[in-house]
Regions:
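Short helix-terminating capping/connector loops at secondary-structure junctions
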Residues: 53-55, 90-96
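Amphipathic alpha-helical protein-protein interaction segments
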Residues: 35-38, 53, 67-74, 121, ...
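Short beta-strand-loop-alpha-helix junction that forms the active-site gateway
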Residues: 42-45, 56, 61-76, 102-104
Length: 163
């Protein structure tokens, strides 16, 4: 998630806000600013596009499932934020929830590539293919790290994976 957040943050236009459930990247106790909705929910990434009236809010949820669980993961994430999305719409904003699944072996299917393309377009990310490859590689490396640590009694703080 850190790589996706930093890519979006580095490329975004000035009137687009990007928040993430990462240290130093959220507001208060949420990734949704209070002027949008008072909530303790923390979508992985929240995009607020103020180029339009009303502002457009995009809630992004990133999941790393097994390939066989990709559709179930998307359904779970959509359902998890359905009430928040509806509350934001009721408050007068446009809102959509976009679940993104990068399979634990690094595969990104066409639906997720399309969703990422939409997010990248909004944030004006130019290096689409490079970012997709990096997300895929990070998923695979992260899964491999978890696998190698499966018999460990404790987790040590490990430096962030670099694509």
């Amino acid at each position: 998630m850190a790589h996706l957040y930093s890519t979006l943050k580095e490329n975004k236009p000035d009137n687009l806000e990007v928040y993430a459930d990462l240290e130093g990247a959220f507001i208060g106790s949420s990734t949704v600013p209070v002027e949008i909705m008072l909530t303790n929910s923390r979508p992985d990434i929240t995009l607020i596009d103020r180029r339009h009236e009303p502002a457009s809010v995009t809630l992004v949820e990133l999941t790393i499932p097994f390939t066989s669980g990709i559709n179930a993961a998307a359904d779970r994430k959509r359902a998890r934020y359905e009430f928040l999305s509806n509350d934001i719409k009721d408050a007068g904003f446009q809102c959509q929830t976009i679940p993104i699944e990068v399979c634990s072996r690094g595969h990104i299917n066409s639906r997720n590539r399309s969703s990422l393309a939409s997010i990248f377009h909004t944030c004006q990310v130019k290096k689409y293919q490079q970012t997709i490859k990096s997300l895929s590689k990070l998923s695979l490396l992260g899964s491999y790290t978890v696998y190698n640590s499966r018999n460990s009694d404790s987790w040590n703080i490990v430096s962030l994976l670099k694509p």
